[in-house]
Structures are given as C-alpha cells and as structure tokens.
A protein has these predicted regions:
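Short, aliphatic-rich beta-strand segments
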Residues: 5-10, 165-167
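Conserved strand-to-helix beginnings and helix N-cap segments that scaffold or border functional pockets
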Residues: 20-21
Length: 294
C-alpha cells in the first residue's frame, strides 16, 4: 500500500494453525515493519481462485515459500526505486532494518517512502511500472522430511487396568522455526490427539451396526486433566529445498504420540507376556489382557 502497509493474499486456509500470525511474521521480519502493518487474507476465492489447500503439514513450506518469493520481488523492484531516489545503482544498495541503504554511507530510504513513490510515481525510474503488487507460485523441488523422537512413561493399575501417563517428552526437528509458540502449540495439540486415539477414542457399534457414541455426549475424548505436562524441545536442521529452510510440524505430535503411548503400555505389561493390544487401550481391555496372560 502507499502507506507502507502490506496485504498478503494466500490460497492456503487456516483452521487453527495460526497462518495469520506466521505469514505476517515472515513479511514483517523481511521488510522491517510491524506485525500490525501486515494483513493476511485467506479463503477469498475472488482474489485467489486457486490453491492446493491446507494438508500434509505443507502450509509453511509451500505457501510460506510463495510468500517469500513475492517478498524478494518487492525488494528487487524496491531497490530500483530506491536507487533512483538516492541517485545510485541498485547494486550499491543493501536492505536492512526496513530501509534500502547505500553501502558504506549513511544515505538511505525507508520501505514506506519507496511504497509511496511506487504508487505516486512523480519522481520515478524511467520505464518502471508503478505499483508494488506481485503474485508468486511455488512448486517444491522436493519433499520436506521432519523427524523426531517421542518418549512416553506410563503406569498401569494392576487392579483396574487404568493407564496413567506420568511423563511425556517430545523432541522434533521442523527445520527453521518461524514462531516457536505456534510450533509448540501444534505439537501439544497433536500429542493430545494421539493420546486420545491410543487411550480413549473409538467408535462403538451394537450388534445391528448402530453407532452408539455418535455425539460428543457419548464419544470419549481426552480432557486437559487427562494430559500430563508435555516436555518439548527441538533440533534445527534447515530444509535445503525451500527458501525458508522450514519443514512441517502439524502432524508430528500425532504421528509420534500414538505408538509411543501404546508401546509404553505394552512394555509395562511385559511381565505378563502381553505383546499386542487393540486401541483404544481402555481399562477393561488392559485388565482383560492381564487376566488372560495369567
């Protein structure tokens, strides 16, 4: 915008992952402007009619990279405008702290001034089209490969078969991390989902095929008081296949937690000779497995 504010139109829709914050942060950090100066618009097919959607932990790696491509285009054109205003060559400029600066001097022009000039081109480079609007598409050169290790410690009540998680540790590698709080939130949510699948959640049918727990009144999901304190950490191995060096994190918690919980329970029952349990590991199933092993 002529005011120096930025609007991002994206084809990936957020449904709880915090795209609005992360995408705005990419642009704000790149241009040296405030987060309040960046507006993210998603789900608007009038402005962005095509988008491959939000799935596969791909939003930051694919959509974030497309945003970064547009950021680079803005900087490249902005350098030509700034060079005209500063009477130098674009190659003599470097962008830092929200300004194009002439190397080795104190001469500079701010991002907002360049944006205003781009839309009010009274003093403007010859043959340069006004405006600072760019659209970018990004096709990943390869897949990203996040990885991690999840450790679960459980206690099993021998009298009732009830499983209690006493400690849960997760260490994941999602490449460069844009927003640590959002990444941690994604891991927490995923781990909770995985614990729910392992211990609580399941469709129950009667002999006639009628679903018995079809509402949230009857379907068992984990509550906050069923969850332990999650201990999380990260290693950082930048992905070489995208400009941000990022990997997806949205599925890490669920992928790691379900087998970690089930394996921990089976390990706790190793003295009974239990080697397999069907999810969810309801107390009656665990108790029955122990009785059968006896």
């Amino acid at each position: 915008h002529p005011t120096g504010k930025v609007t991002i139109f994206v084809g990936a829709h957020s449904h709880g992952q915090g795209h609005e914050t992360t995408f705005a942060q990419i642009v704000a950090d790149s241009f040296g402007i405030g987060m309040d100066d960046v507006n993210v618009i998603h789900g608007d097919t009038e402005n962005v009619p095509f988008g491959m959607g939000t799935y596969g932990s791909r939003s930051i790696a694919v959509c974030g990279s497309a945003i970064m491509k547009s950021v680079d285009k803005v900087k490249e054109k902005g350098a030509r405008i700034a060079a005209h205003k500063l009477e130098c060559n674009p190659e003599d400029l470097e962008f830092a702290n929200g300004s194009w600066n002439v190397k080795g001097t104190e001469k500079s022009v701010g991002f907002g001034d360049v944006a205003l000039t781009a839309y009010v081109p009274h003093d403007y480079p010859e043959n340069e089209e006004p405006g600072l609007d760019f659209a970018s598409f990004y096709d990943p050169a390869n897949f990203v490969y996040p990885f991690g290790a999840h450790i679960c410690v459980v206690e099993v009540d021998k009298e009732t078969g009830e499983v209690k998680i006493v400690r849960y540790i997760a260490v994941d590698d999602a490449g460069n991390i844009i927003n640590p709080m959002i990444v941690e939130g994604q891991v927490h949510g995923g781990v909770a989902h995985g614990i729910g699948q392992a211990l609580y959640e399941g469709a129950v049918y009667d002999d006639s095929g009628q679903l018995l727990n079809a509402s949230m009144m009857d379907y068992c999901i984990p509550r906050a008081d069923n969850m332990p304190f999650f201990e999380t950490d990260h290693t950082v191995t930048p992905c070489p296949h995208n400009p941000l060096g990022v990997k997806g994190i949205g599925e890490a918690g669920t992928i790691g937690s379900t087998p970690a919980v089930v394996n921990a329970v089976i390990d706790a029952l190793s003295d009974y000779g239990v080697k397999d349990l069907q999810m969810p590991l309801l107390p009656q199933r665990v108790w029955a497995a122990m009785q059968q092993a006896k």
